[in-house]
Amino acid sequence: MTSPNEPRTASLYHAGAAAGSAVDPSLAAAIVTATLATYLVVAVLVPRSVVVMAAQAVLAVVPITAVVISRRRMPAPGTARAALGLRLPPRRFFVAALAIGATTWYLNMYLVALLPVTERQVRVLAELVDRPSLAAALVMFALVPAVCEELVFRGILARALGRPLRLAVAAGISAAVFSAYQLSIAQALPTLTLGFVLALIAIRADSALPTMLAHALNNAMAIVMSRDELPAASDWLARHPAAALLGGAASTAFGIAISVRRPDRIVPT
């Protein structure tokens, strides 16, 4: 039981996290390094026709394997599933995920405009999303990245950093790694901001499940709107950019606020 006079350590500051569920920061660094190294090798060696799915699979297979092996060799509190961040958090984190995932994609459109992105880079990204069917695009570029990338960058890295570091510092470091992993100027700033917000949720929730939802929804909305699958919505956004921007900012701020608010203080009886 926590005393009101107990010093605010990092674990108390983040509160809500199940003690011992995240992996040790040094182990997390090793897992992320091994995962990204394997990812680069696969991206170079695998045929382009399957490189997206193969490279994404690495982001899930390597961390899962590493955590399972480490738990067998060095028993630690909690299960491997909890260590990966695959535990159910309070419902408010899923509400936050919906609020953030549904609107952050629109805010990031304005951030992309600030970057030195060439027309060719924009065209390549657009063709990548437009070429497959809508269902295939949603699976390849929304569902799969949401699960695989969140597992390593939020389930492993962000939660591990959240143990010794303050919330904003841990979220900032993990977001920077996530942004660098993209290897794309066009995606650098949007993924940095998205990664920071998702890390806040993952650390507070001690779970990657809500961030998977937010990530999948963010990507799905970007894909659907980029392909003009919802012409009425696209037309409204084009005619009311200020209202859309204000609404998106408010929704994202709401999601962040309910994610980072401190839980009720435990009073000794």
Predicted stretch roles:
Residues 39-55, 110-136, 185-186, 224-244:
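Membrane interfacial helix motifs at helix-loop boundaries and amphipathic/re-entrant anchors
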Residues 1-21:
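Short, Lys/Arg-rich, polar N-terminal cytosolic tail immediately upstream
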Residues 51, 80-151, 158-159, 163, ...:
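Juxtamembrane helix-loop-helix connectors linking adjacent transmembrane helices
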Residues 148-173, 200-207:
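Membrane-interface helix/loop boundary segments of multi-pass membrane proteins
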